[in-house]
Regions:
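Hydrophobic residues within well-ordered alpha-helices
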Residues: 43-45
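Residues that recognize and position ribonucleotide moieties
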Residues: 2, 9, 52
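Acidic donor-binding loop at a coil-to-helix junction in glycosyltransferase catalytic cores
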Residues: 21, 27-39
Length: 129
């Protein structure tokens, strides 16, 4: 679910119409600029919808990604994303993520950890409103 790009998703509208909606707080043009596809798929799964992966090309696009290099703002937003996806586990994910992603981040592990925790904390405040 975490490795999927929006343009790789197709679905039957009638299956999701009354069950799942995009979380508009996530995605380009919103507060948190990525993660909408991951949230959408996890929400589909949590609502009992079936998710399939087909290793078949259905479209071709230039190799572009919002996840190639994580700047400080991206790291912060990933913290919010992990809080949205895994509310009970997100705190336990911070250190492993900081270690695994340190090579694609434009900062050190201490700052990665701090930014992830800040994203988690700020998103929790939004949830509590």
């Amino acid at each position: 679910i975490l490795q999927v790009c929006s343009i790789e998703i197709t679905f039957r509208v009638l299956k999701i119409k009354d069950k799942v909606r995009f979380d508009e707080r996530f995605g380009l043009g919103s507060r948190y600029k990525s993660g909408e596809e991951n949230i959408f798929l996890l929400d589909c799964y949590n609502k009992g919808l079936k998710i399939y992966f087909y290793n078949e090309t259905i479209n071709i696009h230039p190799k572009e990604s919002t996840g190639a290099i994580w700047m400080e703002e991206d790291i912060y937003e990933k913290g919010a994303l992990f809080r949205r996806l895994y509310p009970k586990m997100c705190f336990f994910m911070v250190l492993p993520i900081a270690i695994l992603k340190r090579n694609i981040c434009k900062t050190n592990i201490f700052n990665i950890t701090k930014l992830l925790f800040k994203g988690i904390k700020d998103y929790k405040k939004e949830e509590d409103r």
